[in-house]
Amino acid sequence: MEYIYLLRQALVYLTTIFWIYELTISLAALIKFKEKPLVTQKKHKFMAIIPAHNEEKVVGNLVESLRNQDYDKEFFDIYVIADNCTDNTAIIARDAGAIVYKRFDEAHKTKGYALNWFLKQKIEENADYDAFLVFDADNIVDKNFLNVMNRKLCQGEEVVQGYKDIKNPSESWISAGYAFFYWTMHRFYHLARYNVGLSPLLNGTGFMVKFDLVKNTGWDTRTLTEDIEFSLKQIINGKKLGWATDAIVYDEQPEKFVASWKQRCRWTVGHIQCMKYYMKPLADAVKEKKTIMNFDGLLYILGSVPMFIVSMILMLSNFGIYFFDSMSVEGLIVNLLKFAIPTFIFPIFSALFTMYIDGKKIKPMLKWIAFYPLFMGSWILINIKCLFKQDIAWEKIEHVRSINIKEIA
């Protein structure tokens, strides 16, 4: 029993230090920092890349929003990768004004493969672009997106994540859960880290990469979370990613639990894959470079599945001590509340606070706020499942919200 006590106490200290660190960093999200100075003044040329698999219902609106950018038309091109499509995605995208590349490879369906296939061709062509932007086909892009990313390039940034807002935040408790989660992460993880000189992470869509950065390697990713993988590879190489709150892209979220479950299972397996491939390189980078940014990247990996395992061990240890008559019922309840409050209750207050300071419309979201702990709690079951079953194939998330930028604005 003494060993259980010692293990439990060590894990308590470990998790306490971890969360104190996270809380300290997150406070930087409340401080307004000055914009970085410009290191050059140039109108950069972009290519917007849209991987799309059977997205005929939504891709036209995305292309339209890109064509309506408040940016000189001769300085950007729109490419749609019609990836294993069996519908009219290619026709609709071309009619909307995009340049369409058709790809057929049933064995390699993920966005990472499509990006690598497309960028390899552009690298071989020595295409005349300064940077590329990546969007999901269901997105709608704010008209100032390219202007903001051009400014970021002029500030010397090479990889920048834009602000992924939500097209359908109040449609269901599931889409609301995504909205609460992303809004909170945007401010208290990504912006906070950017403010203190650490690295935010790419977020799947609405990001910019300087073209020169991939000319030697291509888009070389192999996990189910190509965005996180690419981010970690940059951090290992000592490159800090940028953040652009005012480069806004609206993304459609699942509205049904089954679709959300499948998507988040894929993300969790992707994180496990990233942990497998990049935990040691990150640890080596911490040892060699001795930078807080590398250490923070390592903590991100450790803070996902490993920290979940630690939390589960801590929670279950309470039952072990209780069953051996070394803890009262009251003590068991108190210790379980110490786990439940930060896991299920704190997210409600953090979501409400984030909406308030970011000027989000709170009233339409109030009907779903009580369900947010259920959304976050379901991640516990997802993590447990994915620890034991990781042979998850990529499955398409259906996008049906045909909304244009005028309807959102």
Predicted regions and their residues:
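Short, acidic, metal-binding catalytic loop of nucleotide-sugar glycosyltransferases
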Residues: 64-75
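Cell-envelope/extracellular polymer assembly enzymes that use nucleotide-activated donors
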Residues: 44-47, 77, 229
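A conserved acidic beta->alpha catalytic loop
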Residues: 82-90, 105-107, 140
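Juxtamembrane C-terminal module of membrane proteins
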Residues: 24-44, 280-293, 297, 321-409
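Acidic helix N-cap motif at the loop->helix transition within catalytic regions
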Residues: 60, 87-94, 102, 144
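N-proximal low-complexity "stem/linker" segments adjacent to membrane-targeting elements
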Residues: 1-65
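Long helical/loop segments within the catalytic core of UDP-sugar-dependent glycosyltransferases
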Residues: 104-125, 143-223, 265, 272-276, ...
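Short beta-strand-to-loop acidic/aromatic patch adjacent to the donor-nucleotide binding site
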Residues: 126-140
